Each structure stands twice: as C-alpha cells, then as structure tokens.
Amino acid sequence: TLMTKMWTYDEGSEKREPVSKTLDRFRQEAGTDYFDILLLHCMTKGDWAETRKFYMDGLAKAKQDGIVKAVGVSCHNWDAMVEAVDNPWCDVILARLNPFQSHMDGTTEAVNELLGKARKKGKGLIGMKIFGEGKHVSDAERERSIRFAVTESNLHCMTLGLESIAQMDDAIERVMRNAKG
C-alpha cells in the first residue's frame, strides 16, 4: 500500500498551490501513477472540512480520475477525529492510539471507542504513535503496544517509527506472534 500525506494551508494562504500540481510532484518523486491512500496531514481542529475544502475538492477529483484510491486525514486533535468519523468524504483516518495514553487525543478507551464507530461506518483505520512517540520502547512496553494494536484496538493497521532493520524485524516478529493469537 502506497500512502502519503499532504500539508495544507488555511483558505486564502499564498502558499496554496493546486492539488493536481502537488499530486503530479508526489507521483514523480515516488515514481508511480497513483497513490493507494492520500491523507490531509495534521488536522488539529474540528472544522477542517470547512477550512480544507479546497484540498478535499482537489482530492475528490483525483480520486474520481484514479490518481488516488482513498482519501482521509491524519488527526492530531479529538474534534478533528470526530469530524473525520462523521464526514463521508473521509475514507481513512490516521489516529494516535496506544495503551499508555501517551501523545493521544483522549483516553485510550475513548479514542478506541470513537474508532470503533468509524470502523462500523467502513472507514480504514491506521494507528500512529503506537509506542507513544518513542516514549514507551522497553521490551515489555513494545510488546504491550503491539499486542494492544493487533488484538484489542479497532485499527486495521499501524505505522511505526523505526530507526534500524533490527527494530523493524522485532516489530514484525511481535505483530506476527500477536496476530496468531
């Protein structure tokens, strides 16, 4: 699955450029004709659907044209996540979730419950900050984090911040072991 995120600016910003131009640059840089998932990055307010309509419209056209298969948002605020759950434009939500309630937008239980509502609506759910933005990386904490993400959360998949092949191998081994139950 090829996913990327697009930084956005408020309505009226001189930094805004046409979505199609940004997507053309992304596709050239990645050497691809399309992206499976494209997210509006770092939504921090519940009104993102109003303030980011320019981008939503551009991505809706790209989706219609087959340049993007699914669209969504990365959430960095509770209200932004609620908006993502309720907004039919949003196919995928990237949300901060871990069993330590570290660097999240609510309690572990509340975020997981909200994501359960999104899951029932057919949205794709990707977890981030699984290790609490690198604050919970002891062996026991990594195990607990992966076990939670794989067996207890409403996530479909997760992104992990890793710094080495050994860390990647460790994470894969933990996911595979926990997925087998």
Set out the residue ranges of the language-model regions.
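Short, charged beta->alpha transition segments
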Residues: 22-30, 80-82, 114
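Glycine-rich anion/phosphate-binding loops
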Residues: 12-21
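Beta/alpha (TIM)-barrel catalytic core signal, keyed to glycine-rich beta->alpha loops juxtaposed to Asp/Glu
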Residues: 42-181
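A short, structured active-site edge motif that brings together acidic residues
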Residues: 1-11, 38-41
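Active-site groove signature of glycoside hydrolases
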Residues: 27-47
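Intrinsic structural disorder
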Residues: 1, 6, 24-34, 61-63, ...
